[in-house]
Amino acid sequence: MRSINLANVSFLEARDHYVFISTVHGAVYKVRDSMTNQSRVFEQYGFLRVHKSFAVNMKHIEAIYTTEIICAGRSIPIGRSYKKDVQPAFLAYVGGQ
């Protein structure tokens, strides 16, 4: 088991029964789990589920557009079913800091 500094985690991506945890330094860690489980764990640390395959660290959001988020320099798609929750959640996060 490896310890990861959550402040450095930029986003989570689910692929093929694994969740890939990407950091701002370019490191990627692979965990065999579902995005549902991992996003619930990370949610309490300021992560937001934005797509069936992605959750982002709101600390690293650079821009929010209609269909994508720029997070730590990477374009992350916003899923249709998550779209209505993204902006209010981000504004609440920024307002709570």
Regions found by a protein language model. Name each.
Residues M1, N8, H25, I70-R74, ...:
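Eukaryotic intrinsically disordered, low-complexity regulatory linkers and tails enriched in Ser/Thr/Pro
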Residues M1-C71:
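Conserved binding/recognition cores within well-folded domains
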